[in-house]
Amino acid sequence: MAEKRNIFLIGPMGAGKSTIGREIADRLHLEFFDSDQEIERRTGADIAWVFDLEGEEGFRKREETVIEDLSEKHGIVLATGGGSVISTNVRNHLSARGIVVYLETTIDKQVARTQRDRRRPLLQTSEEPRTVLENLAVERNPLYEDIADIIVQTDDQSAKVVAHKIIERLDF
């Protein structure tokens, strides 16, 4: 794994990918990117607006392009969007270009961490957030597990502790 200088964080919304990613990048002196923030930077609009205007399909196309571009860099930590793994291309790019770390969390923790966040379009529906998260987990968790080089549980641990556990397992 030594040749894999990139670290890609995958997992569901509310797992802590952005917070933990920044912590890892700081400790390892790597550049940090968040795919959602990069989409917002490139479009000049927030994710909710992109979803409203282009729908999920349009958003996923943008996400795939951003992840393809960023994963070509060297020496980065990238926090990906929770649904990015739906794309076969994204899964292939991440697997081939870095160490993939799956941040695992329970539905209970996801609900607690996302309940006040109005910037998550998939939770802004008439469905109960818990139901949405459960359905997404059924679809996405096998995809996360399939491409993960490292799996770390994030429940009841600080970002610093999780980052430390990940760094200990990296072959850098």
Swiss-Prot record:
GO terms for cellular component: cytosol. ATP binds at G14, A15, G16, K17, S18, T19, R120, Q157. GO terms for biological process: amino acid biosynthetic process; aromatic amino acid family biosynthetic process; chorismate biosynthetic process. It is an enzyme of class 2 (transferase). Gene3D superfamilies: P-loop containing nucleotide triphosphate hydrolases. The keyword Electron transport does not apply. Pfam families: SKI. PROSITE patterns: SHIKIMATE_KINASE (PS01128). This is Shikimate kinase. It comes from Colwellia psychrerythraea (strain 34H / ATCC BAA-681). The lineage of its organism: Bacteria, Pseudomonadati, Pseudomonadota, Gammaproteobacteria, Alteromonadales.
